[in-house]
Amino acid sequence: GVEDLILLEPLDEESLIKNLQLRYEKKEIYTYIGNVVISMNPYQQLPIYGPEFIAKYRDYTFYELKPHIYALANVAYQSLKDRDRDQCILITGESGAGKTEASKLVMSYVAAVCGKGEQVNSVKEQLLQSNPVLEAFGNAKTIRNDNSSRFGKYMDIEFDFKGSPLGGVITNYLLEKSRVVKQLKGERNFHIFYQLLAGADTQLLKALKLEEDARGYAYLNGEVSRVNGMDDASNFRAVQNAMAVIGFSEEEIRQVLEVTALVLKLGNVKLAGEFQANGLPASGVCDGKGIQEIGEMMGLNSVELEKALSSRTMETGKEKVVTVLNVIQAQYARDALAKNIYSRLFDWIVNRINESIKVGTGEKRKVMGVLDIYGFEILEDNSFEQFVINYCNEKLQQVFIELTLKEEQEEYKREGIPWTKVEYFDNGIICDLIEHSQRGILAMLDEECLRPGVVSDTTFLAKLNQLFSKHSHYESKVTQNAQRQYDRTMGLSCFRICHYAGKVTYDVTSFIDKNNDLLFRDLSQTMWKAQHPLLHSLFPRGNPKEASPKRPPTAGTQFKNSVAILMKNLYSKNPNYIRCIKPNDQQQQGRFTSELVMVQARYLGLLENVRVRRAGYAFRQAYKPFLERYRLLSRSTWPRWNGEDREGVEKVLGSLILSSEELAYGRTKIFIRSPKTLFYLEEQRRLRLQQLATLIQKVYRGWRCRTHYQQMRKSQILLSAWFRGNKQKKHYGKIRSSVLLIQAFVRGWKARKNYRKYFRSGARITLANFIYQSITQKFLLNLKKNLPSTKVLDNTWPAAPYRCFNTANQELQHLFYQWKCKKYRDQLSPKQVQTLREKLCA
């Protein structure tokens, strides 16, 4: 399916629902209508949230990523921060559609992307922790939703010039206080009652005079005291912690729980019918123990409380008349008191939160509003609550149409494009039907409540039938404009309004009572007399000295005034919309009920929204991102374009066969009238991408082969060089090892040779040599002393002392004899020598 319904072709209700279904089945729960986000409740946790996705959507513009609440929150926050424009985020949808979760996601995103710092973090934590407190006191399990908000909430978050949160203000609308005393089968009362009973320890329960079993309380539906997947005890502790973080003191938390317990105990006060002495019906309390416990806990006079529940004081001029109440009236008074106490407690909690998160005066600030309010409701039995809820949605639809058209018109004006009048359904006639100050339904309701005489829902309906009998958007059983006499779906006590989202039949029963919302003054004064500080402060009008005879405004008037203030607030801000839809009534993941979604789409006016958005130009985008996406369609702009963005866009669109009526060039944006044109551009882009992909593949494959060859060649050369080098290294290593071995051997041999004489093994030779040298020396010295005469004829010679000298001794004797002969010859004269020579010759 398409991500933006503006681009849906063909545009009709069936194709719109089919597109939502296709996306839902693929777990794409968000879809755009321009800058509107449609959110489908997935009834499961999807992996599309958290810091990673927040960082992703923070860095991209609205249409660059898939549709997401984060994208809308980012646009709102950046517009507030950078453009100094106050923002509001309107979250609408029926119960169970995921409005509360959507508001949490918006707040968590803003908290994550805004500034840091101890003070800023404290403010962010207080803003975030307000949610569990308001959910506990304002949410309940209904047939459609286990955590349904039973009140409307508008929060203004205020920021400084840097975009850091300073605080905020919360406004609540139309708490469903009737739930306090009665719930439908399969539903629960407000969460806080069950959380208190399940999470409070024994000591606290004893102090509050409560029992743990929810079945013991008339105001609680004991059949569904627990909800699957909801831990009331854990949630109670979370609520206490949240209140502490916000700034509630321990004493304030205790007082809030005591008033909450008071509501439960009031429901257990049983009233029985009695008769006075004159025979008129009266009423009284059956069991005084409950009243006694309430009196002790709240500091009340139990007798006065019992009297206030069973009688009523009326002032006529200067006289006071006490009227006894029958049992039905007394039960009504008891329930009215319980509803008023809880409603005022809820208002007090909201005001107390506002005191903690409010911003000091004098600071310049920017504001982001978040509105989480009921969506359009059509139930089997529609009463006063549905009437005011649908009135509020009519006003919101009016705001949406007017602001959307205004925004379109302003954008066209900024871009210098002629504005074309848009045909759309103006629901102002329906708003006037309801809110007109003199002739509106609410005005008639107030008039009927205030007029003297017999007043009933029937007389109110008769007045409406008379006044609006010819109104095109009003129908009833007796009006003739639509001939509804034979319509069995409408009772005699009903009227029907043709809202923008469809026809709704309202039963006027209890319209008067709910609009009056009266609390007898006796009960108000009794509560004011309480010694309990919080309960006392909830009933300032109970002070007899300050009591005003002026009747308080009716519930309808209060709501109308609140809506008027809200509308004024919304008109002053730049709107952002989140439309929440629930895909099925069973709260099952993956299940899509087309009929249910179609009804909600009508209530939310989705088709009307798309048509308004498409009335002029269906698509618009700044020149730069448009050129970045489509520049590949023109040879002039691909692969590089160095000129102006608008000129580049004109080159791209000029190269395509497009009608000039389909295009409009604004100052900063290109406008395309028909989705078909955009789809044509996308198709051309897809084909061009295929061509470029083929080209890229071809170039890449050639490059890959060349690169592979070069790598193989380099590898072969490297391997060869390595092999040869390694071979030489091994050869050199062997030679070097051999040389080192020989050197080591020679050096060792020389060392051993040099040091051999010092070894023990050479001691014998050394000693033998020494002895031999000693006897040789002695032999030679003795021979020197005993030499024979030098006469030649003397042949005497000393004998050798040892046999080892025999040879040496003979040699010495021979040498000595030759020496003597030489010495004798040297003494002869030459004549004697000649004579001797001749004798020898003879």
UniProtKB/Swiss-Prot annotation:
Residues 563-585 are annotated as: Actin-binding. ATP binds at residues 93-100. The keyword Phosphoprotein applies. GO terms for biological process: actin filament organization; actin filament-based movement; cell projection organization; endocytosis; microvillar actin bundle assembly; microvillus assembly; regulation of protein localization; sensory perception of sound. Residues 689-712, 713-733, 735-764 form the IQ domain. Belongs to the TRAFAC class myosin-kinesin ATPase superfamily. Myosin family. This is Unconventional myosin-Ia.
